[in-house]
Swiss-Prot record:
Coarse class of the protein's main subcellular location: membrane
Record organism: Buchnera aphidicola subsp. Baizongia pistaciae (strain Bp)
Keywords: Cell inner membrane, Cell membrane, Membrane, Protein transport, Translocation, Transmembrane, Transmembrane helix, Transport
GO CC annotation: plasma membrane
SMART domains cross-referenced by the UniProt entry: YajC (SM01323)
Stated name of the protein: Sec translocon accessory complex subunit YajC
Family, as annotated: Belongs to the YajC family.
Compartment annotation: Cell inner membrane
Subunit structure and binding partners: Part of the SecDF-YidC-YajC translocase complex. The SecDF-YidC-YajC translocase forms a supercomplex with SecYEG, called the holo-translocon (HTL).
């Protein structure tokens, strides 16, 4: 029993906690944050800015594509952020301007209808 207790004391005294360098931890954190910034935040911000420019450039008569799959011509742009799209003759829908994905070149709808 005495041998067992002395063995436990020897094991306790022989284990040392390695001291870690706090600078390496900070460096790794900065590396991960910079990778996260350049891989996620920056591209997302560019995408949002590009979409905002698209929304601001909308005008009457533009042919647009929405995220819900509608293709139509802008009939009216309201001040509240909604757009009235003409999908077909006498078929109009209200769409939130944030859901406009792209603007087609003029005459695209005529080409699509003739197909």
């Amino acid at each position: 029993m005495d041998n067992f207790i002395s063995h436990i004391y020897a094991v306790e005294n022989s284990t040392t906690i390695p001291s870690s360098n706090s600078y390496s931890l900070i460096f790794m954190l900065l590396v991960f944050l910079s990778i996260f910034y350049f891989m996620i935040f920056r591209p997302q911000r560019k995408k949002i800015q590009e979409h905002d420019r698209l929304i601001k450039s909308l005008s009457y008569g533009d042919e647009v594509f929405t995220s819900s799959g509608f293709v139509g011509k802008i009939v009216k742009i309201t001040k509240t952020g909604y757009i009235v799209l003409e999908l077909n003759n006498n078929v109009e829908v209200f769409v939130k301007s944030d859901f406009i994905v792209s603007i087609f070149p003029k005459g695209t709808l005529k080409n699509m209808k003739s197909m």
